[in-house]
Amino acid sequence: MFVSTGGIDFDKKKPSILLMHGSGLTHIVWSLHEQFYASQGFNILSVDLPGHGNSEGPSLESIEQISNWVKSLMNVLGIKKIIIIGHSQGSLVGIDFASRYPDLISSLVLVAGSYKMPVNQDLINYAEAGDEKAVLLMMKWGYEGSKAFIGGNPVKKIINSSREIREVLAVDLNACNNYKDGKESLEKINCPTLCIFGDLDKMVPLEVGNKMVSMIKNSEKKIINNCGHMIIFEKAFEMRKSVKEFLSK
């Protein structure tokens, strides 16, 4: 299991932030965030889920399994409460975890997330076949219209082999597609929650995001303009500022 700490040693006296990446990705997507949050006095746990990046083993097949894995990680590290910042699929994990383990979470940040993430069947078929078209479709639907990526979209550089598409991305997409408890889970969330959306995101349109926010008690919303699905890259500094203000309350 690989966990990046942002270059700072883990200290049980500090509050801990878990950075949860999205489908097919790795901890690398949080490279503009790890040291920033660490400098604010938090432990950083930027994970590669099993089967992703530097973590061995098969990919976990359901959102519930990933939540249970997070609970096990907390037990190993002796963490009693966690702050979860989840992007895309990572938001589903945050929603599920907060609803099932309310005593283990202090705050939740959902980035480009929704309580349900149905996946286009063509996208799943391409991914299961290890076809690069799966990555191209993700990039088109998530980031079309965004001008943030000079020199190429970084997602393609992370998911860059047919094995990764077939054994990692496809499993993650099916996990998102098969998660059906989102609406009920939202109603069980009690911790302070920040929802961050990009106005150009075609994977999580604003109307879907607004509906989700209305269903979470003690929640607030931040909309980032001229931004697609990959907020953590596209508008990292604006996002970090919003998260810092939220966690300071």
Each model region followed by its residue ranges:
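Catalytic histidine-centered segment of alpha/beta-hydrolase-like enzymes
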Residues: 227-240
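Conserved alpha/beta-hydrolase catalytic His-Asp/Glu region
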Residues: 125-188
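Flexible "cap/lid" loop of the alpha/beta hydrolase fold
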Residues: 92-136
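Alpha/beta-hydrolase fold catalytic core
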Residues: 1-18, 39-43, 79-80, 163, ...
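Catalytic histidine neighborhood in serine/cysteine hydrolases
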Residues: 206, 210-229
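Active-site loop/oxyanion-hole signature of alpha/beta-hydrolase fold enzymes
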Residues: 4-6, 31-39, 43-86, 241
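Active-site glycine-rich loops that stabilize anionic/oxyanionic intermediates
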Residues: 22-25, 88
